[in-house]
Every structure is written in structure tokens, then in C-alpha cells.
């Protein structure tokens, strides 16, 4: 089970909509880096029944089923997700509804923003730490990336860049 005295990461490793879901292998690698840096943190994957659950379990398998991941803990309703979000230390993953709930509960979050989403529009700017990475953070203004398709834009967001920025975010706000 979960020890509420220890830090908890809620990880949005998948999403309902494919176009809002970062590459699984990159997600698995990034969370593995997190586990190496913060082995004391307990991790809960946030997923809905059906396809999201299948995706979450596949990522868990790709990671080698680390003991830090409590794969069977799942919020079965929005109300349960709110209760869970009140207990976590931070959120990481795909930008989406779960991140909004976490933010409303006053918890910090770092997200990967889908190419179809405007980071400045969706990430709140208030006293709760919230940051993320979008393909537009990687490209320079002179590059012609608007013509790229969604997958090519997502490919610009490397696992190393996500880990470096997320790690800096954790340190900057003294989250762990």
C-alpha cells in the first residue's frame, strides 16, 4: 500500500485522446530517471478504464514493474481523483484533466503539452507551481515547424529535455 508519510507522485502516463499523449517509451524512460533520482517517492499512475488502463500497464511493464509504482491504485471517479490529488506531493505527465484537478488541490505539476495545445493558455500562472514543456519551447522562432504533423512536433520533445526541465522544476520549487 501507500505510505502517506512519504512523497507521492501522480503520473499521467497516458490520456484519453491519442493526440494528447506523449510517446510511451519516452514517458517510461523519464519516470525511470525520476525513480533513480528519487527512489523514496511512491508513484501512482493516473488512468481511466479501458484503453488508458491498458496503456498504463504497458508502460509499467516496459519499466520493468518497479516497486515504486503502485499500479493497482486507481481513482474510480472524479471525486476519488480529487481525494487522491489532495494526498499527492506532485503531478507529472500529459497535460489534461487530471492536472487541472491536481492544481485545484494546490499541488505542483509539470506536464508535457500536446502540439495542439497552447502552453500559456492551459498552464495557470498563480501561486501553485505549474510548468511544462511544449514543442514550441524547443524550436526557435525562425524554424518552420508549423508545417510538421503532430507526431513530428511531439518528436521534438525529447526525453532528455523533459527530464532536465522537470528535474530543474523540482529543485527550483524545493518539491522533494
List each model region and its residues:
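Conserved hydrophobic helix-helix packing surfaces used for dimerization/oligomerization
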Residues: 9-11, 43
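Leloir-type glycosyltransferase catalytic cores
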Residues: 126-176
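A short, flexible beta-alpha/helix-coil linker loop
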Residues: 14-18
Amino acid at each position: 500500500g501507500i505510505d502517506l508519510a512519504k512523497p507521492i507522485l501522480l503520473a499521467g502516463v497516458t490520456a484519453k485522446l491519442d493526440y494528447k499523449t506523449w510517446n510511451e517509451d519516452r514517458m517510461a524512460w523519464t519516470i525511470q530517471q525520476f525513480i533513480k533520482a528519487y527512489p523514496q517517492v511512491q508513484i501512482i499512475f493516473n488512468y481511466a478504464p479501458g484503453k488508458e488502463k491498458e496503456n498504463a500497464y504497458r508502460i509499467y511493464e516496459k519499466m520493468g514493474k518497479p516497486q515504486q509504482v503502485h499500479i493497482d491504485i486507481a481513482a474510480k471517479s472524479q471525486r476519488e481523483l480529487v481525494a487522491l490529488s489532495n494526498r499527492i506531493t506532485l503531478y507529472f505527465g500529459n497535460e489534461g484533466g487530471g492536472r487541472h484537478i491536481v492544481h485545484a488541490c494546490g499541488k505542483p505539476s509539470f506536464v508535457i503539452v500536446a502540439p495542439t495545445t497552447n502552453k500559456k493558455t492551459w498552464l495557470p500562472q498563480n501561486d501553485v507551481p505549474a510548468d511544462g514543456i511544449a514543442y514550441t519551447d524547443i524550436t526557435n522562432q525562425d524554424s518552420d515547424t508549423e508545417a510538421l504533423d503532430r507526431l513530428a512536433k511531439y518528436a521534438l520533445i525529447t526525453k532528455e529535455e523533459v527530464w532536465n526541465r522537470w528535474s530543474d522544476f523540482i529543485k527550483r520549487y524545493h518539491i522533494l
